[in-house]
């Protein structure tokens, strides 16, 4: 998995599935962010459901939005 320069990776739990492959994710610290699925996960048809544990990559510029890069089994 390629790491993005300056991106913050944090674990969270999917709370709600939204339209257009967006998800509301509650992070370990209690904050909720809006996240979309990374392209590799979309390409390999990895499904994400509510209550899944995921790793979210946050940009240092906007900490309210992120990208889901991994789903725990």
Curated annotation (Swiss-Prot):
**Domain named S1-like: residues:** 1-73
What is the superkingdom listed in this entry's lineage?
A: Bacteria
Q: Which protein, by its recorded name, is this?
A: Translation initiation factor IF-1
Q: Which PANTHER family match?
A: TRANSLATION INITIATION FACTOR IF-1, CHLOROPLASTIC
Which residues lie in coiled coils? none
Q: CDD domains under this entry?
A: S1_IF1
Report the InterPro entries cross-referenced here: NA-bd_OB-fold, RNA-binding_domain_S1_IF1, S1_domain, TIF_IF1
């Amino acid at each position: 998995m390629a790491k993005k320069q300056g991106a913050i990776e944090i674990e969270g739990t999917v709370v709600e599935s939204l339209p257009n492959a967006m998800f509301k994710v509650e992070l370990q610290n209690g904050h909720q962010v809006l996240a979309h699925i990374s392209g590799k996960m979309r390409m390999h048809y990895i499904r994400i459901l509510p209550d899944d544990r995921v790793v979210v990559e946050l940009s240092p510029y906007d900490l309210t939005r992120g990208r889901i890069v991994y789903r725990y089994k």
